[in-house]
Amino acid sequence: MSANKVEAVLIDEETLDLHELASACAVPPTWVVERVEAGLLACDSAAGEMRFASAHLVRARRMVTTERCFDANQEVAALVADLIEEVEQLRRQVHAAAKRSRG
């Protein structure tokens, strides 16, 4: 695991364009376009321009890390991102249920 840990604040109202997302992930824009076209990374298209929410940035970074660290193909990287997102959702549900049972 890398000693360089990046912390980010998610701002749901802010979106990134294709080049901003690619730059934030340290990948070429073609990397992003390939994954969008394959249905592995979602985007919002307004007036023909790709826009990415903060959740898309988190997913893209996970996919980049998985591809680089484990020499995984894009489909495996997307599956790993799906599983991480599912675990996070389940943890939120367990936490919410625990709060309700205490209160």
Feature roles, as predicted:
Residues S2-S23, P29-V33, E37-G103:
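Arg/Lys-rich, alpha-helical DNA-contact motif
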